[in-house]
Regions:
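Signature of N-terminal electron-transfer/Fe-S-associated modules in redox systems
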Residues: 1-122
Length: 122
């Protein structure tokens, strides 16, 4: 399957962001000896929300009730272009590339807030 990924790049919270194709971007980064695309992750089990991504303009992607780490590439068609961007909201400012400042979410958790999620699929 051939897919084109367009990844959001942003140096810091004050810089203007831009979209770039992952294959071209990665080739340029490797050739220049620069760091890879920055993104946040935590559990990789679909319960933490650390990914904080939008896929094709949809939070976590086009499937309902799943997170980005649960999104299977097989749902896309050969030749699709996939836009991968960070959540861009006042409460979650972009730190760099695909990583956002989740301290607002962390404050809710520290105050005792939680979300119950069934991860077994039943």
């Amino acid at each position: 399957m051939n897919l084109t990924l367009k990844i959001w790049r942003q140096k810091d919270a004050k810089s203007k962001g831009k979209m770039e194709m992952l294959d071209v971007l990665n080739e340029e980064l490797v050739n220049k000896g620069e760091e890879p695309v920055v993104f946040d992750h935590d559990c990789r089990e679909g319960i933490c929300g650390a990914c904080s991504l939008q896929i094709n303009g949809e939070p976590h992607g086009p499937d309902r009730l799943i997170t980005t780490c649960q999104l299977h590439m097989r749902m896309f068609k050969d030749g699709d272009t996939i836009f991968i961007e960070p959540f861009r909201a006042k409460a979650f400012p972009v730190v760099k590339d695909l990583m956002v400042d989740r301290s607002a979410f962390d404050r809710i958790q520290h105050a005792g807030g939680y979300v119950s999620v069934n991860t077994s699929g039943n």
